[in-house]
Amino acid sequence: MSNFFNSLFSDKGEIKGINTQYSVSEIVDILKEEGHSIYLIQDNFWVLKWQGTNVVVVPHDGGDIQFWIMYNDDENRFSLRKVNKMNIDYRVGKFYLTDDEQLGIELLLRNDGNRITKSQIIQGIAALSLLDGLAKKEFW
């Protein structure tokens, strides 16, 4: 590469001057603008609540943003067969069972080298809300 092109890139191969990540406060502001209340903020994650469901939001190095929900259930209503079927039918996120047979939903917004857009964050929350509703319909 010429010196000109080398000057455009950081040592990691990323284009200089383009921020590929949102700060925690920027994502919190986007979620608050959408009417979500954020009630726990740690350095590496925060929790928002909607319709009685806690959603953990984790920003990762590189700009990816992970959303996940865990459901506790003492009645053992979650079956691997149903979870697998939901993963086949709804590929927007991932349903899974933990080792202690609790249901989880994960949705990962991947940074493709550009910045994840505000609309992608809003669509991600909408998709997670849809998956939450499907899980509640299926298991409760």
What is the predicted role of each segment?
Residues 1-54, 97:
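Charge-rich, low-complexity N-terminal segments
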Residues 19, 23-26, 75-79, 120-127:
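Short amphipathic alpha-helical segments
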Residues 96-126, 130, 136-140:
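Well-ordered alpha/beta subsegment
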Residues 58, 77-79, 115:
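Short acidic, gly/pro-rich beta-turn/loop elements at beta-sheet edges
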Residues 64-107:
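Short, internal acidic amphipathic alpha-helical interface segments
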Residues 38, 90-93, 132-135:
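Short secondary-structure junctions and interdomain/linker hinges
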Residues 46-65, 69-70:
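Short N-terminal mixed-charge amphipathic segments
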